[in-house]
Amino acid sequence: MKEFIIRDGKKLRLGYTTGSCAAAAAKAAAWMLLSGRKKESIRLLTPKGMELALAVEDIYLSPDCVRCAIRKDSGDDPDITRDTLIYAEVRKTETVGIVIDGGQGVGRVTKPGLDQPVGAAAINSVPRRMIQEAVEEVCGLLGYTGGLYVVISAPDGETLAKKTFNPRLGIEGGISILGTTGIVEPMSEQALVDTIHVELRQRRAGGADYVLLAPGNYGVDYIKGAMGIDPATAVMTSNFIGDALEICRELGFRGALLIGHIGKLVKLAGGMWNTHSRYGDCRMDILTACAAAEGLQGGAAAEMLCCATCDDALRLLKEQGLYDAVLHRLAGRIDDMMHYKCSDIETGAILFSKEYGYLCETKGASKLLRRIKED
């Protein structure tokens, strides 16, 4: 694709989804099967309203079956499916209608709560509709009223899936065919939030009332090493802590416990619900404010404001004899902000640092932890 967007002052090239690849491949294969003629390019109108003109690759053409592929172009997005070939194989059937299924390298759903039912190929609803409409368009143009069987495959999918959330979500054997707009926008925050939503929805469908959240690998490692909990029980939120809490509320969880490094979670005390540094860095401001409320003054406060890391600030608090008091105040502030954010579910947080280990927790954290272990 040649289309671009501007993000954070950078010009970034758009791409197209695996769903667009599957629909375009199915459209091309259906056209070749029903017309008997080879087609080396295909046009596809995406749900976003953008039309794609895509090269058709690796064509196999016979009277009974046509198979071809579209190469995934992720644009400037760091997508693991970049350059992967997504295949569609189309055959005529004696029954009326279009049947869509997954083949090699397309995962199968094994747990409830996902976009597709258990046992179905992991081809999500929008890509299924895109495939259906693309094939129906060809049938209409060529006057075909019979049935067609469409199989979507991705030969590299089983290997690629090991680098995705699919194994944790209960999708086995391959990748998912995804996309709601048909277009990939580089570094899309919404795509990351959607991933969190999928995993939380799957946990809720599995019967969980309480959920453990971790912003990143530090939190997961701490959960495993210091708390003796299977890290697979935690849902990774990345920087989208506020979104994750709102999703928990929306899905009907009774409670959510957040476990993370102080460098991330201190920002919650300032009402910063997306903790990415592009939205600001208030770590030392918040810690210094908490310390000042506990009596830190003058030069020591100025020194804390200049600390490069939270561990440096904690070291200074120890020297000033304010370590416990400030952490207690910080936990209280985080508790207040989490309650303000999601007052209709139980929330809690446990903070740690790599140098000092366990630091503090909000007042409901221990109870939530027990419930998560029992859930």
Model-derived regions, located:
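N-terminal charge/polar-biased segments
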Residues: 1-18, 32, 36-39, 140-141, ...
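Flexible, glycine-rich phosphate/dinucleotide-binding loops
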Residues: 159, 220, 358
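A structural signal for small-residue-enriched, beta-sheet-centric alpha/beta enzyme cores
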Residues: 3-6, 13, 169-175, 180-329, ...
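Generic N-terminal targeting/processing segments that precede catalytic cores or assembly contacts
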Residues: 1-163, 167-169, 364
